[in-house]
Amino acid sequence: MGEAEEKLEPSGPLLPEVQHRSISPLRSRDFLLFWTAGAVDGLGTCASSLFLPLILLGAGHSAGLAGLVASVALVSGLVVSPVAGVFADRWPRKPMMYAAALVAACAMGSVFVTVALGHVVLVHVLVAAAVEQAASATYGAAASGTIRRLVPPEGYTRAIGYLQARDQAVQIVGPTLGGVLYQLSRWVPLLADAVSFLLVAVLSKAIRTDLTPDREGPVAPFTRELAEGLRFVCAEPFLRFVVVWTAGINALLGALYFHAVFASHAQGAGPAAIGLILTLAGVGGLLGALAAPWLVRRVPAARIVTGASWVMVPTAAGLAFASRTWTYGLLLSGVSLIVPSVVVVLQTRAVLVTPDRLLARMGTVLGTAGQGVAVLAPVAAGVLVAEYGGRAVALGCAGAFAGLALYATSRARLVVGEAL
């Protein structure tokens, strides 16, 4: 226990201007700029990404090709993210953030121009979407290393909770905004996305805090630094636990979400009813994120992680026997309600146990592990539902959740720190 508690101390020095600050993170000018940049980025991306396949379909391309563009874009982001993490731990992070935003703006701006002119070229859209995702991954890698510089340790829990609430709100508002813009004209969401990236660049540039990572000694070869980030995560028991738990939860929740959509469609539910499922889940996630800092300050961190893991077992089992669309929505809303508190606990402790010079690499390793399995969830859910039926898939997920909960319970000692 003693060794684990020592690791709770910040591994890198805090800047003087944030060392003694105890105000709400949102009252900090630079954190507010950072928070707003992420909100604008998320809204623009949600507004365009959901409707880009529709634009390709409208141009006469097949659904398979439209799906290929989306898949290539996602894979490009996953591949670039660990590479960007190395450079985000080498270079000043703020220039990386606004430069990446400008690249993404140019990529989406070029698609906007071609769509507005009525000349949609598949290869151009594919390349632009891949570049946009790669730039977004670069921005995310640099951003993942900033929290320690913008917020003092006692503010980590609230800051991460605010970031969670922002992301959940974007998931609710973004698709609706995109739908409204698409009704105006099919190129309007693309223009909004390009403009949003320009705003992100301006907001990132306006941050005054020095976000340059701490360095110890000369720069090592790229491959060595890439491997160092992976080795650090593998060598730190808590971070290994985060990788397993996050990857497992993302895969299972993704499968459950798509199971609910497929099952509702099979029961004759229309688009509005299926949209209700996603809306209820989004509202649950938003409420959970808003409540997370309050809960984390009052409940031991280990209890939050193990308790949430076990609660997901009956929830998944309940989905196996649900027969109405609103039931799917309420059950998924319940899951979404409890996950943010666990995320706040895990992310707060991950920042505390990681040296500043490794923050971006740590963040990209965890993010790639979690997102990589989530990409496979829709395909896996579709195949399994078609082969075994929705009820069997939901019960299988419940069994997998039970295994994950047992793993979390056996590793509860790793989550020794109360949230600050």
Task: Show where each model-derived region lies.
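Transmembrane alpha-helix termini and helix-breaking/packing motifs in multi-pass membrane transporters
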Residues: 50-59, 112-117, 173-192, 265-266, ...
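Juxtamembrane intracellular "pre-TM" segments in multi-pass secondary transporters
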Residues: 12-32, 204, 209-244
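Intrinsic disorder in cytosolic terminal tails and internal cytosolic loops
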Residues: 1-24, 224, 411-420
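Helix-loop junctions on the cytosolic side of multi-pass membrane transporters
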Residues: 145, 149, 190-220, 409-420
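C-terminal transmembrane bundle of multi-pass solute transporters/carriers
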Residues: 79-83, 90, 94-106, 110, ...
